[in-house]
C-alpha cells in the first residue's frame, strides 16, 4: 500500500497544493514552523479522519475559508483508490471511489498509517489517556466496526454520567433507568475490552522479539492490558458478570461523584521489561526502545490483519533516536514500507535512506520537489 498523491485545499497553511510521492521514502525538509508537520497531519487525516495534534476541526480550516479539503490516490493490491475528506464548520464529509460514505467508520481503513512522533516516545511514560488513544487509533483502522462500538460506548457513557449527575443533585428521576443504562454500558464495554485485550496480545507477539533484538538479547518485553474487569478465560459473559458486580459495589460512590468510575475509558496498558514496570522503573533508553518496538510491531500487525503494509509517518522523530535505534528502525522498514519523514536537517538521516529518498523543501506553506 502507498499514497501516490495528495491534493490540499485550504488545509492549515496550504491554500492550494498538489504533490506526487515516491512509493519508498519521502523527506520533507525545512525550518521549524514552515508546515512540515501539517503535511504529515494531512496524510493522517486522509487515513483516519483524525489528527494526532487536535480534536478541534476548525483548526484545520484556513483562516476566513469555509472548508478544508484533502484528496489522495491510494494504491493497494494493484488498484488505485481515490479518497476525499472535506472538513467544514459543521463536521466532515468523506468519499471513497467518489462515493459518499454515510459514516466515517465506513471510510477509515482504506489507507492504513503508523505515525511515530516525539510525543509517541511518551507512549510508555505518559498518562493512561495517551495509551487509550493509541489503542483506539490502531484498532480502529484495522477493524472499522471498533470505531462504531467506541462511538456507541461514548454515547452510553455520556448518558449514564448525566443520569448519575441528576441522582447526585437528588432530582426526581426513575432509579430503574440507571440499571438499564448500566446493562447497556456493560455490553458495549466488554466488546471494547475484548478487542483491546486481543490487540495487546497480538502486539506483544510482534513487539517482544523486536525489543529483544534491539536490546541485544538483554531484555524481555511484556505488555498487559489492565482492564476494569478480571480477564479470566475467554468468555465475555463471565467478564460482563464481573463488571456488573463491580459496578453494583461502587454504585453509591458513582452517585456521590456523579460520574462513571470504571470501564474502558479508565483502562490502561502496562509495559514490563524483565518483569519490571517500565513506566515506573525503566530508563529513558528502555522507554524509547519499548516505544520503537511497539511502533515497528504495529507495522507487522497491520500487515498481518490487512495483507498490506501501512504508510509510515516519522514526524521529526529520527533526531530523537540515537544512531543504533535509528538504523534499526530504517533497516526494518527498508524496501517494504512507504515512509514520510519530516526533519530540519538531513545530517541525522542514514545516507542509504537519503539516496533512495525523494526530498521536498518546505518553506512558508510552499513545497518544492528536489
From Swiss-Prot:
GO biological process terms, semicolon-separated: DNA replication; DNA synthesis involved in DNA repair; double-strand break repair; SOS response
Entry keyword annotation includes Isomerase: no
Keyword Kinase applies: no
GO molecular function: ATP binding; single-stranded DNA binding
Superkingdom of source: Bacteria
Cellular component GO terms held in the UniProt record: cytoplasm
Family per similarity comment: Belongs to the RecF family.
The protein's role, per its UniProt record: The RecF protein is involved in DNA metabolism; it is required for DNA replication and normal SOS inducibility. RecF binds preferentially to single-stranded, linear DNA. It also seems to bind ATP.
Name of the molecule in the record: DNA replication and repair protein RecF
Originating species: Listeria innocua serovar 6a (strain ATCC BAA-680 / CLIP 11262)
